[in-house]
Regions:
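N-terminal amphipathic/basic-hydrophobic helices that include classical n-h-c signal peptides
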Residues: 1-25
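A structural signal for long alpha-helical coiled-coils and helix-turn connectors
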Residues: 58, 62, 138-142, 181
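Hydrophobic alpha-helical core bundles mediating ligand binding, dimerization, or RNAP-core interactions
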Residues: 43, 47, 51, 58, ...
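Short, charged, low-complexity loops and linkers
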Residues: 29-44, 112-116
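Short, contiguous alpha-helical
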Residues: 13, 28-30, 44-48, 52-55, ...
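Acidic/histidine-rich alpha-helical segments that form the ligand environment
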Residues: 112-150, 157-171, 176
């Protein structure tokens, strides 16, 4: 990305702006490959953060509590995990060469509540394995893949669009898992971000650790 600047700044303020623009231009990526690699790194970072957040929320509830539904018709943690596992597998298996909605996927079954708590152990094992499919793909993708076409339900997307779509999708479901854990644990919930009333202390600690 380059910024257009005046060749002859009119005053001191313009000179300052021009200098800052020049510095930014020198520091910014100079080609699309660098931008693409930065995007892929950002995607991996975001997905890893979402998984970590979900893991920390799920660690605070028991297998029995995975089946808790806060209201009739709402999804339990088990159903949300079940759905995300199915989505991860379908979207990112053979990502570049097959439709992201696999014919073998049974999406409606992902929203069926598990019959017993005994099924939670298998679901807990499937969860990290499904995420690994995504992380392995991100390790393989390169900047020049981002504009390649892929299909989801027969609709064409670029790789960039398809991955960004899942960033938003998983963020919403991870938020649901965190909220469920907060409802279940109540006052005993261990905060996964800056605790209430602790913003100033957190900011001070960040400043001191720079």
């Amino acid at each position: 990305m380059k910024l257009l600047i005046r060749s002859e700044p009119a005053d001191c303020e313009d000179k300052i702006f021009a200098r800052r623009a020049y510095i930014y231009r020198m520091q910014a990526p100079s080609d699309s490959a660098a931008v693409g690699e930065a995007l892929l790194a950002s995607f991996r970072h975001n997905f890893q953060q979402y998984k970590t957040l979900a893991d920390r929320a799920l660690a605070q509830i028991s297998p029995e509590e995975w089946l808790y539904q806060p209201a009739s018709g709402s999804n339990s943690a088990a159903v949300i995990v079940q759905h995300m596992v199915g989505n991860l597998r379908s979207r990112f298996t053979d990502f570049l060469t097959s439709d992201g909605e696999k014919p073998t996927r049974q999406r409606d079954q992902e929203f069926a509540e598990p019959a017993t708590v005994a099924s939670i152990a298998a679901l807990q094992a499937e969860w990290p394995a499904a995420w690994q499919i995504l992380f392995m793909l991100l390790d393989e993708l390169r900047a020049d893949d981002l504009l390649r076409p892929v299909l989801i339900r027969g609709e064409a997307h670029t790789v960039l669009q398809a991955v960004q779509r899942q960033v938003a999708h998983y963020a919403s479901h991870v938020g649901q898992l965190v909220q469920l854990a907060k409802i279940i644990r109540g006052d005993d919930f261990q905060s996964l971000s800056i605790a209430r009333g602790q913003s100033q202390q957190f900011n001070q600690a960040m400043t001191e650790n720079r």
